[in-house]
Amino acid sequence: MAAVGAEARGAWCVPCLVSLDTLQELCRKEKLTCKSIGITKRNLNNYEVEYLCDYKVVKDMEYYLVKWKGWPDSTNTWEPLQNLKCPLLLQQFSNDKHNYLSQVKKGKAITPKNNNKTLKPAIAEYIVKKAKQRIALQRWQDELNRRKNHKGMIFVENTVDLEGPPSDFYYINEYKPAPGISLVNEATFGCSCTDCFFQKCCPAEAGVLLAYNKNQQIKIPPGTPIYECNSRCQCGPDCPNRIVQKGTQYSLCIFRTSNGRGWGVKTLVKIKRMSFVMEYVGEVITSEEAERRGQFYDNKGITYLFDLDYESDEFTVDAARYGNVSHFVNHSCDPNLQVFNVFIDNLDTRLPRIALFSTRTINAGEELTFDYQMKGSGDISSDSIDHSPAKKRVRTVCKCGAVTCRGYLN
């Protein structure tokens, strides 16, 4: 259960001292509603099917074991098919059954004989696990959308295995500095332009070109920093030089990959080439701390460290525990996203924001990827990687499948 006031003070929680079933029983006994555990005014005194657990045939009548929403498993009951008005759940039950049978037959789908009177315990157990997984993923999806501060929606999908939400991941929208690191989030100066597209603006003050064209697409080469208008600028929110700060505009889906790469991210809408897609955020730590954590991550076979080496190599972004959708974006040696360094309110060149832009048109349903070796400088040479404190460790085999695959993530 979330601790009181946790939302206001940041992402933290404590373990629940009792089971979900016990909480539901207590709520019903005291006539209390609690949406987070499924107790609502609608089902406080009524019964609503949450999912179907099992199946049997008795005297030629079909029965399903029903889990009632907001009620503990001890109240599950067998109900005749004719009494069930939940076609979607019935279809889901059937799909899960066939998926399980396909898996045990190594991909060869089979149709169970009509004279089967009961389900095998292993099938029923799998169906219940899938139902509980869907509920957990839906709750996680709802939480992600409550925490995000951008326009694009976040969806979660797993049709591959029984993996549920990550147990130790907290969604954030901006950098989270580690103790001892200070982030300046207020610019010292801003422009007074009436039209930032044509007038000398923040990029010119920094000695670089305006990063975007009139279609909000990036026009500068990789390695060139982006300087957007900031909180001290006189221009409004429709300024053509305010793109990254508006956040992700596209609806994205965190999905389970089928080739052993864990979670991935795909777009649900078409993304034009050279468009801003998302920021890479996480905990900002020192490079020394990154080296220490990196040894631990290597043993687990994960890679979430991103060196902020635009001008120096003092800091690293660690998205292992704290991050946004970018935490789940997979590596590819032939990616469709490109890294750029961005400066908005914090102009400290040691601490650029990391933005990911599309390198080409990305169609709806296509997975988003970026090159884990690519930096905001545009450099992907092996020399720059070997000398990076966050990368100078055990090499991880790459599974991107690209024709140009280098064989390793780092």
UniProtKB/Swiss-Prot annotation:
Any one GO MF annotation of this record: S-adenosyl-L-methionine binding
Binding locations of S-adenosyl-L-methionine: 261-263, 304, 330-331
Ligand binding (Zn(2+) 4): 333, 398, 400, 405
Top-level class of the enzyme under EC nomenclature: transferase
Annotated catalysed reactions: L-lysyl(9)-[histone H3] + 3 S-adenosyl-L-methionine = N(6),N(6),N(6)-trimethyl-L-lysyl(9)-[histone H3] + 3 S-adenosyl-L-homocysteine + 3 H(+)
EC number: 2.1.1.355
Record's GO cellular component terms: chromatin; chromosome, centromeric region; nucleus
Phosphoserine modified-residue sites: 381, 384, 388
CDD domains, sorted: CD_SUV39H1_like, SET_SUV39H2
Subcellular location: Nucleus; Chromosome, Centromere
Binding site for Zn(2+) 2: 191, 202, 229, 233
Domain Pre-SET as annotated: residue spans: 189-247
Residue ranges constituting the Chromo domain according to the UniProt record: 47-105
Post-translational modification: Ubiquitinated by the DCX(DCAF13) E3 ubiquitin ligase complex, leading to its degradation.
Domain (Post-SET): residue spans on this chain: 394-410
SET domain sequence ranges: 250-373
Binding positions (Zn(2+) 3): 196, 229, 235, 239
GO BP term, example: cellular response to hypoxia
Function field: Histone methyltransferase that specifically trimethylates 'Lys-9' of histone H3 using monomethylated H3 'Lys-9' as substrate. H3 'Lys-9' trimethylation represents a specific tag for epigenetic transcriptional repression by recruiting HP1 (CBX1, CBX3 and/or CBX5) proteins to methylated histones. Mainly functions in heterochromatin regions, thereby playing a central role in the establishment of constitutive heterochromatin at pericentric and telomere regions. H3 'Lys-9' trimethylation is also required to direct DNA methylation at pericentric repeats.
Entry text on domains: Although the SET domain contains the active site of enzymatic activity, both pre-SET and post-SET domains are required for methyltransferase activity. The SET domain also participates in stable binding to heterochromatin. In the pre-SET domain, Cys residues bind 3 zinc ions that are arranged in a triangular cluster; some of these Cys residues contribute to the binding of two zinc ions within the cluster.
Similarity remark: Belongs to the class V-like SAM-binding methyltransferase superfamily. Histone-lysine methyltransferase family. Suvar3-9 subfamily.
Record protein name field: Histone-lysine N-methyltransferase SUV39H2
Species whose genome carries this gene: Macaca fascicularis
Species lineage: Eukaryota, Metazoa, Chordata, Craniata, Vertebrata
